[in-house]
Structure formats: structure tokens, C-alpha cells
Design a protein with these regions (language model features):
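Conserved acidic residues
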Residues: 35, 105-106
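Membrane-proximal basic amphipathic "stem/tether" segments
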Residues: 1-18, 22
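Short, structured coil/loop segments at alpha-helix boundaries
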Residues: 2, 68, 80, 103-105
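Short amphipathic alpha-helix with an adjacent loop that forms part of the alpha/beta core around
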Residues: 95-105
Length: 106
């Protein structure tokens, strides 16, 4: 495994076209293709998304949680996002149930 400083430099000097600060590239570098995620505060489906690149280009499975329903129309227009998104308060969800529903349990 790379040292944290080398890993940081590798990620810092790359830029993602999707996430704000390379969070997607950081996760991809650490875990590779086919990972899992829970994205709380998903926001827009593509712009500033920490999970778009992972889901669409690298076969990650997971789900998002977003309370701001005004971005739902953007998700409806983004068919490449196949993983579930829950339009709810993240503090009230039954995550164990959702993980099972989405076949994410190991």
C-alpha cells in the first residue's frame, strides 16, 4: 500500500470532472472497481457528485440519500444512474433494511 502522502499527492494533482475535491478518485484509488457506497447528501446526480464516476464508469453499487427534493427532476433526467436514491431524511432511515434491499450486505 502507498504511503498516505504519496496517495494524497497522486489524488491531489488529478482532477475529477465530477466530484468537487477528488473524493471519487480517492475512493477509486483505494478500493478499485466494483466497490460499494452510501452517499448521504447526494445532491445532483452528476455535477459535484462523489459517486457518479464510481457508479457509471467503475461498477460500484450503493445508494444515495437526499432530502432536497428540488433536485429530483435532475435525477429523473440521468438514466445512467441506476442505483437507488432515497428522498428522505438521512437520520430516519433503516440502513440495515436498505442495505439488504439493495443487495449490499456481505
Amino acid at each position: 500500500m502507498q504511503s498516505p502522502i504519496k496517495l494524497f499527492k497522486k489524488i491531489f494533482y488529478k482532477t475529477s470532472k465530477y466530484s468537487q475535491a477528488g473524493q471519487d478518485l480517492f475512493a477509486l484509488e483505494l478500493f478499485g472497481n466494483g466497490g460499494s457506497y452510501i452517499d448521504i447528501g447526494s445532491g445532483c446526480p452528476k455535477e459535484n457528485s462523489n459517486t457518479y464516476l464510481l457508479e457509471v464508469d467503475h461498477q460500484w453499487k450503493g445508494f444515495g440519500v437526499e432530502i432536497v427534493k428540488s433536485v429530483k427532476n435532475l435525477w429523473d433526467k440521468c438514466p445512467e444512474r441506476k442505483n437507488a436514491i432515497y428522498w428522505d431524511d438521512a437520520t430516519t432511515l433503516d440502513y440495515k433494511k436498505i442495505v439488504v434491499e439493495n443487495n449490499l450486505s456481505s
